[in-house]
């Protein structure tokens, strides 16, 4: 009930005030988190380009073999399929990182609101209602 909510509120205020000494500390932490995620996206996109180029090269080689009447080895086809799977996984990682950026913004906005609380009279802000 109310006691549990008050305890949770006090713990949140203590946690945020121990982590951050000012609003600008929160801004800086958010900036760092977003930069880290953006770097992960850039690296994953580079990996995706590399894997896509490998797959396209394998597909061209397979087409050349086929046109010249040579059989295409199963391992070759497996490598193409493996590259396609890697591409799908990398695209999914990129989507997840973009979603994570939205979550980070909401998380730090919540931290800002908790940081501003002087007491727990009105309880914690609702995480879902904190503007992003």
Model-derived segments and spans:
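Extended aliphatic helical segments
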Residues: 13-16, 26, 42, 51, ...
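Charge/polar-rich, low-complexity and marginally structured segments
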Residues: 25-54, 58
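Short, flexible coil/linker segments at or flanking structured domains
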Residues: 22-25, 39, 46, 64, ...
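Charged, long alpha-helical assembly modules
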Residues: 53-132
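Long, low-complexity, compositionally biased polyampholytic IDRs enriched for Lys/Glu and Gln/Arg
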Residues: 1-11, 42, 88
């Amino acid at each position: 009930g109310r006691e549990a909510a008050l305890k949770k509120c006090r713990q949140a205020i203590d946690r945020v005030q121990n982590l951050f000494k000012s609003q600008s500390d929160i801004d800086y932490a958010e900036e760092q988190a977003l930069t880290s995620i953006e770097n992960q996206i850039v690296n994953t996109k580079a990996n995706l380009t590399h894997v896509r180029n490998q797959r396209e090269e394998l597909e061209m080689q397979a087409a050349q073999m086929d046109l010249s009447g040579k059989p295409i080895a199963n391992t070759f086809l497996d490598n193409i399929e493996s590259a396609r799977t890697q591409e799908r996984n990398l695209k999914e990682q990129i989507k997840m990182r973009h979603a994570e950026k939205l979550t980070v913004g909401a998380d730090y906005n919540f931290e800002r609101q908790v940081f501003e609380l002087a007491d727990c009279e009105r309880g914690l802000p609702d995480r879902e209602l904190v503007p992003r």
